[in-house]
Amino acid sequence: MKVNYTKRLLHFKEPAGTSRGVYTTHLSYYVIVEQDGVKGVGECSTLPDLSCDAMPESRYESLLDQACHFVEQTGGIPYEMLRPYPSILFGLETAFAQLDAKGSWALSSTPFGRGEEPIRINGLVWMGTFEEMYDRLEKKLQAGFHCVKLKIGAIDFDRELELVRHIRACFS
């Protein structure tokens, strides 16, 4: 079994405002597990100041190195070592799931897994101006989301309540 990872700097389509700041880029790691010519890929990803296992890049890569070495030596995931680091655990579990699926990207045969339907349970609306948030909210509601999460704190509280009243009016 061969295990390694690669990192990519991803760019948000538009700035993502949170209570901890605004994100324009996102560093993500992809773990690749290969056995008998079959590859499994899993994403290990955190958001600084939001994810419980966010840390300096060098420390994160050191943990990834240790986890990859363990997997290569044992053929298994070091669950106890990775419990405090759910992003790395998720990436390895996803890579193994794809490996078990003989390299197929279709990890589950569901409408979502086949790309036929989205999961409409958490439509996230990032912080922005009132108009930006209202437009994003409208798009989520039109897309059929039944649960919408608003990132609040960027605008006047009364204006944020206006957004909540709008949601309630749509479902009354």
Positions of PLM-derived features:
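N-terminal capping/lid subdomain adjacent to the active-site entrance of alpha/beta enzymes
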Residues: 1-172
